[in-house]
Amino acid sequence: MKIISYNTYKCTQSKIDHILAMDADLYILPECFSKEHISLHEEYDMLWCGDDDLTEKGLGVIWKKNLSVHVIPGYKKIKHMLPVIVNGSGFPKFILASWPTVWKEKKTYPQLLLEALNEYSFYLDRFPSMVVGDFNCYIGQNGVRKSKGTFEDCIAEMERRGLRSLYHEQTGEMFGEEKTPTFYWQFNQDKPFFLDYAFSTM
């Protein structure tokens, strides 16, 4: 199963079309329009979570209809995380689509991610799992209190559950020492960050 995660900053239909042309089975799309504001080919379906007054900036999950994707029972809204079970490509898998967001929220990005990891621990422990998306988190993050949870705590929690970062596993790089940024603050090449991750037990 091919999975693509891509932040669709200032989402447009042309961006969606470009991403879908990459021919993945499942897409995790932070900063995505809600389903009502984009057009999808009939072979695709979509889930979305976000704020009703900010429909151009939520978390979208798009998949080919040969897969079965559904939100877990009793889903608790954590901004913005979508916990889904995926069937149709071998054995069932649990995927926690992730875009921790502090819009109208008093918690920090790592705090939200850590909350989701604990909330969905039942599924992380029982299914082949992936936590994937734009985490809005990095090592030594400013404005984050240790008492509330840091990204280092999030990494430790995922590793404790057998989730490993695919990027770091493949490159051998250390967290906080990534050579390939995934984001440039204000499009400034002198302000690189590594914010996008895929942690997996698969």
Feature map (PLM): residue ranges:
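N-terminal, active-site-proximal structural segment of metallo-dependent hydrolase catalytic domains
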Residues: 1-42, 51-56
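Active-site-proximal beta-strand elements of phosphoester/diester hydrolases
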Residues: 1-9, 91-104, 132
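Catalytic metal-binding/acid-base residues of hydrolase active sites
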Residues: 9, 33, 68, 99-101, ...
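Short catalytic/ligand-binding loop motif for oxyanion handling, primarily in non-cytosolic enzymes
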Residues: 12-14, 35-38, 103-105, 138-142, ...
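Glycine-rich phosphate-binding loop signature in dinucleotide/nucleotide-binding domains
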Residues: 21-22, 88-90, 123-127
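Metal-dependent phosphoesterases centered on the DNase I-like endonuclease/exonuclease/phosphatase
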Residues: 26, 113-198
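Structured beta-strand-rich core segments of catalytic domains in phosphoester-bond hydrolases
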Residues: 32-102
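Surface-exposed cleft-lining segments at the edges of enzyme active sites
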Residues: 71-72, 96-114, 139-145
